[in-house]
Amino acid sequence: MTPGIRAPFFLLLLLASLKGFLALPSEENSVTSSQDTSSSLASTTTPVHSSNSDPATRPPGDSTSSPVQSSTSSPATRAPEDSTSTAVLSGTSSPATTAPVNSASSPVAHGDTSSPATSLSKDSNSSPVVHSGTSSAATTAPVDSTSSPVVHGGTSSPATSPPGDSTSSPDHSSTSSPATRAPEDSTSTAVLSGTSSPATTAPVDSTSSPVAHDDTSSPATSLSEDSASSPVAHGGTSSPATSPLRDSTSSPVHSSASIQNIKTTSDLASTPDHNGTSVTTTSSALGSATSPDHSGTSTTTNSSESVLATTPVYSSMPFSTTKVTSGSAIIPDHNGSSVLPTSSVLGSATSLVYNTSAIATTPVSNGTQPSVPSQYPVSPTMATTSSHSTIASSSYYSTVPFSTFSSNSSPQLSVGVSFFFLSFYIQNHPFNSSLEDPSSNYYQELKRNISGLFLQIFNGDFLGISSIKFRSGSVVVESTVVFREGTFSASDVKSQLIQHKKEADDYNLTISEVKVNEMQFPPSAQSRPGVPGWGIALLVLVCILVALAIVYFLALAVCQCRRKSYGQLDIFPTQDTYHPMSEYPTYHTHGRYVPPGSTKRSPYEEVSAGNGSSSLSYTNPAVVTTSANL
């Protein structure tokens, strides 16, 4: 007998034996117990539950069991590896279904107030689990398994987390939140229609179908590496959180009133659909596409860190953040009163379609921006480098255009002006001390009338009047009038004032004794061609140095000339010039003059000590006589 045939019979026997002592009392609305249903080792398990409690049923390896239960308990079924398990639960409690490695598990359908937990292991195929109870079940599809979505028709909401290379399509129609996990290379499809919420988890390389919730809770969908996640649809007031990771595609559809967090990472696409009042937060990284659709009053913020455009919108009380990273496209669609701000960086395309109450758009750097509508708070957002933003908005917003610079420039004086000193008398106004105060009403009234008169007479050629002074003598007006250069001369101004005395009467001014003199101003200072100031200073310094050098050389030349014109007087000779004639000092009255450079002694200085044989010798007779007498 094949394992597929043995498994149902084994389950029937086991259920019949356990029916008597595992039955639990039924309750009308809720049952607080939950069992585990596990399918393992290439077996096919199809439990059918229609009772209030769930017994635990475990078929051995390579077996196929199809239990039908109509009592108040529900078993826990485990199908071994390479098995296909299909659990249908219609009691008030929730079994836990686990399909191990390389197994295919069918979904468990719950029509009671509890929700089962389904676990699909590696290379297993898991059919969707249908929940209609009030408990919460967890569906887990392990590595390389295929799990069908879990459908909830109660008040709970499932959380679907398929990891890498998995595709999860959670559909939520209950008020609690189940968690569905499909492991690596597995496909999990959990359908929950009870009041409980299963948890479905699809791990790495697995494909998980979405979990549909029609309740008020919020499921969480997590897609891991290389996984594809189908959208999660919410028909209640809760909001699911979808987090598909690397190389995954998530398309959550939301129609609840809570807060939904959608996070896609690394080449994934997430599409949330909101029909309630919830707030969606979408985060996708590395080439993901996020398309949230909003029909409620929630607020979604999309922020991408690279290669996308940024569009912030604020219109409601809740606030969420959508983050898309590295080459992702975000296309949110709003049909309610919610607001979705989207921020993108570095060259992505973001198309936002808003039917909400407030929109604020601020794209930067090569972006296409229409107007900036703002209502309530407006957040500035920056999109850099090749970003394109297209926004269609409607219903209740005010458009704020970009700031433009419009200035009322004063008359350009660079075209050339002419100044005239004007003096005249006003006969019909008395002079008093208030005309000496420029802030007085009398002063301002006369000044205003005079300016209006000149503007009427000279039209556009009159540029202004300044330095108005009033002095006594009725009222004597002394002022400086400015006209365009070359338009009027002093005589023309005087004649125009005299001819237009009737216009002066309209301003309650009776003018007489007009005197006009043209004011001559020196031409504008221009840089004259010549030596600059620093050049002149340098030239003066050089001249002083040259003069000092000339004086020095003149003094040196004079010294050289004086040295050549006079002889050399040896006052202190280096050699001894005194040579005594004899040993008696009385005969030596003075010295002898020795010319410079002469070393030869005078013949008179030589004394011979002999008998005078030398012709050059000199003998003193007195000395000789004296020595003879002795």
UniProtKB/Swiss-Prot annotation:
Biased composition (Low complexity): 30-46, 63-75, 152-180, 276-305
Signal peptide boundaries: 1-20
Localization per Swiss-Prot or TrEMBL: Apical cell membrane
Keywords: Autocatalytic cleavage, Cell membrane, Cytoplasm, Glycoprotein, Lipoprotein, Membrane, Nucleus, Palmitate, Phosphoprotein, Repeat, Signal, Transmembrane, Transmembrane helix
Motif stretch (Interaction with GRB2): 578-581
PTM summary: Probably both N- and extensively O-glycosylated (in repeat region).
Keyword Cell membrane: yes
Tissue distribution of the protein: Expressed in a variety of epithelial tissues.
Domain of life the protein comes from: Eukaryota
Location of Phosphoserine modifications: 602
GO CC term, one of those recorded: nucleus
Membrane topology (Cytoplasmic): 557-630
Glycosylation sites: 43-46, 50-51, 53, 57, 275, 302, 335, 355, 366, 432, 449, 508
InterPro entries xrefs: SEA_dom (IPR000082), SEA_dom_sf (IPR036364)
Site positions for Cleavage: 473-474
Self-association state and partner proteins as the record states: The alpha subunit forms a tight, non-covalent heterodimeric complex with the proteolytically-released beta-subunit. Binds directly the SH2 domain of GRB2, and forms a MUC1/GRB2/SOS1 complex involved in RAS signaling. The cytoplasmic tail (MUC1CT) interacts with several proteins such as SRC, CTNNB1 and ERBs. Interaction with the SH2 domain of CSK decreases interaction with GSK3B. Interacts with CTNNB1/beta-catenin and JUP/gamma-catenin and promotes cell adhesion. Interaction with JUP/gamma-catenin is induced by heregulin. Binds PRKCD, ERBB2, ERBB3 and ERBB4.
Function, in words: The alpha subunit has cell adhesive properties. Can act both as an adhesion and an anti-adhesion protein. May provide a protective layer on epithelial cells against bacterial and enzyme attack.
Protein name per the record: Mucin-1
